[in-house]
Amino acid sequence: MIKPFTTRVILYVLILLLCTAKGFAANPLQAFQATTTPEAVPHFPDRVHTFVFRNWNLVPLERLALVLKTSPENVARVADSLGLPEYQEPAWPTEQIYITLIRRNWHLLPYEQLLELVEMTPERLAFALQEDDFLWVKLGFLKPLCEPLYYQAPDEAAQKRAAAIKKVLQENVGPPLAQKNAVQRFAFIEDLRKTHPDPDFVASDSKALRYIYSYFALYGDTLASDDTEVFSDGLLEKLGRLGVNGVWLHVVLREMAPGGEKFPEFGHGHEKRIANLRKVVEQAKRYNIDIYLYMNEPRTMPNAFFQRADIEGREKIAGAPAPGGYTALCISTPDVQNWIKDSLAYIFSEVPGLGGVFTISGSENHTHCNSHGGWQNCPQCKSKTGAEVTALANALVEEGVHRSAPDAKVILWDWGWNGHGIATDIIEKLPTNIWLQSVSEWALPIERGGVGSTVGEYSISSVGPGPRAQLHWKAAKERGMKAVAKVQLNCTWEIAAVPYVPVMDLIAEHCSNLAECDIDGMLMSWTLGGYPSPNLEISRLFDRTPVPSQAAVLDELAEKRYGKEGAPLARKAWTLMSDAYREYPYSGGVVYNAPVQVGPANLFRPNATGYNATMVGIPYDHLDGWRGHYPPEIFAGQLQKVSKGFAEGIEQLTKAVALAPKPHKYDIEAELRYAEVVQIHFESVANQVHYVLLRDEYAKPETPAARKEEIKKQMRPLVESEIALAKRLYQLTLEDSSIGFESTNQYFYVPNDLLEKIVSCFDLLE
């Protein structure tokens, strides 16, 4: 789940709810109907060639042929004509890459063929669009109206264009596209499955909570399938050695326990989910790791749910209305209160050893009657204050959990309380045997490029804690509660295309600051950032008495990874990159809309598309959506500062790698790759800003002819730079399958996307 905080994203969610009424439409995809014109792809001969290029080696050849209603041989001939690498049977199930497939075919295929490609029923796709981490939001709340796409033998013009593309790729990447020793996508999972028992390892006896998300777990209904791998033994082992003692999972309460007489609709398939949860808990326990369930409850229900005359009192549990024909389950009513408490008590009695839960009770999902501030529209809740309603929603969770598991942790997150403002009025009404969690960096004042603002969340470039978290922790401590900092130590939506951003000075500074606060634990990631990294080790190194200095921790880590000779160079590199990262042009609009996740994989469009950038989905060419509150030139300038500082750091890190002990080469070469990916992405986004500005100026009717000639000259080096960046990033992706991956978005880009960027840029140069 993404937790947006900008007005625009909140509007997205309201529109989503207005567009969906799950389970009541004759056509499950009716709420997601196609309406807009698909984006043109002028650099390919036709749509068939585009489809083959974008899906080659991502799904089985036979399925590509099935979609196009042709033979595998015809599809293979198209791929060969374009100069694509030899066919390799994908080693992953479609479920593991379906989001990537949907996104890259959104403008190519109608729903019927999209369903064939991703092997889904209309019901499953509708569920994915609505429930799988806001996929419909990430696709822009629209489906382009695509004509059916069937194979036709390429005509002479198409053959000629395909041959030109093949020539471009062979001359710039080399036959067979330098993929001979390339790793397949998702190869990192196999690496993370490997265990390496260490008889000398001694687990920390620290009582501090350190919990995180699984790096590669599917976000949706994770426990519904016996075949779903939530995490591997190797991943748990690695996380445990880095001081992690908890992993969290997303669940929906009504799917985890029987609903009883009052809610017979609930609980279908709960037996399997409970059985799988037991297995997960037992697996994690072997590595001294507890499992925590994410509670975002109670979920709203369609209005028809409250109209069942055969269930006594059903109409009385209807609470505040929600958009889209939904209504809250009112937590002021005994039936709903008992259901919440009984369901949680059931889960914790059926799954001994479950670590606990954490709640979000003010998220973008409409849950209890005050989750979006509308408690006064509820007949039962309107006599209470908003703070009382929010506190009650959390108290019910605490009571249910502790009825069966008195020692389980109940972590209450203040996200969204009082519109992200000060919420001490809620804290003072909570039960005291809970842990109060707050985003560390929230409300920090920052200035980037002379532009002032305050931080929301998802920022490594802004070092917490901020004033809101400190005030809330203090209020919690005064009532005898525990306090938890929510942080992102590996990566954020500032850039999520690498497992971790090697800005160790920033991580150490944040951990050091938190060590001075009276807190009891950390949530170390949301769905992004769960990789077992040196950034996590920094947190572990601070978890000692007496607390070491930042310099001591960084020196220790550098020497461990790079040896005595390489350590000083690594430290210098980390400082250069950390200082550069402080210049990141942070804002909610930037982290959600700018092409920071895809870098050079985002195309240079020859003409304005008219499409708005989507939330960590498809950035298109929507510069005004990318830049947030920054003027375009300042936005680009800040990105160039980050890129330049990383380039300087990479020079030092390259020298450090050369001096490092051989046993650590694999890990530190990966660190160097990730630094280079970050540098490439930010240089590319700066290029894209300048390109769009020039392109749009060129397109204005009032632009003089002489100025247009100047613009063309200014655009050429930008296009040439993008070719070079795409070529380098392509090589890096062949070496490391984790580049471009994030669990809820799967692959932001794959190697072929960078080949397409090269092709499109050469087309522009012509």
Regions found by a protein language model. Name each.
Residues M1-L11:
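Bacterial N-terminal signal peptides that target proteins for export
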Residues V9-K22:
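Bacterial N-terminal signal peptides
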Residues N27-V202:
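Long, charge-rich, low-complexity intrinsically disordered regions
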Residues E39, H268-A275, T327-N338, Q380-V389, ...:
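Alpha-helix capping and helix-loop boundary segments enriched in small/acidic/polar residues
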Residues T70, M120, V244, Y287-I289, ...:
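Short glycine/serine/threonine/alanine-rich loop segments
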Residues E131, W136-L142, A158-G362, T367-W375, ...:
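Feature activates predominantly on carbohydrate-active enzymes
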Residues H196-K207, A217, T228-S232, S349, ...:
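Substrate-binding groove of N-acetylhexosamine-processing glycoside hydrolases
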